[in-house]
């Protein structure tokens, strides 16, 4: 066993994950073909569209309107983030709820857990419109509680 505790043998004690290495290579080729600048610009345009739509939802609190990513972190006043995520899931809308592995930041900002939308090049304006439609449900809080 001692001989396998040093490099490079440390990483070669089992069958290499060849399929994932090949898949990772193909994923990089795919992203390069599209172009990372093009993806980033689409992501930011989509985020601007989403913010414009989402900020009109009643009782919504958006924490990062001006960040340079496709991530939108938000809460609905008086709604527990995890409950909102479960509610949205009923409409096939996926968000992440919790502290997003950033508990210290959450504590510094003095906020509770949040919901997070993570937009990328495979998302569409129609999906954002659907999210806003569901968030604008006048009975949302009653249906969650």
Language-model segments: which ranges?
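Pyridoxal 5′-phosphate
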Residues: 1-145
């Amino acid at each position: 066993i001692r001989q396998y505790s040093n490099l490079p043998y440390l990483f070669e004690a089992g069958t290499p994950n060849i399929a994932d290495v090949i898949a990772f290579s193909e994923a990089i080729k795919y992203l390069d073909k599209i172009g990372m600048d093009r993806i980033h610009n689409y992501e930011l345009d989509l985020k601007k569209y989403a913010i414009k739509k989402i900020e009109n939802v009643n009782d919504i609190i958006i924490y990062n309107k001006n960040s340079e990513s496709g991530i939108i972190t938000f809460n609905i006043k008086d709604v527990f983030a995890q409950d909102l995520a479960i509610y949205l899931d009923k409409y096939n809308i996926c968000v992440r709820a919790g502290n997003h592995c950033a508990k210290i930041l959450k504590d510094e900002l003095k906020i509770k857990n949040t919901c997070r939308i993570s937009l990328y090049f495979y998302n569409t304006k129609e999906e954002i419109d659907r999210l806003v439609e569901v968030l604008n449900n006048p009975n949302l809080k009653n249906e969650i509680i």
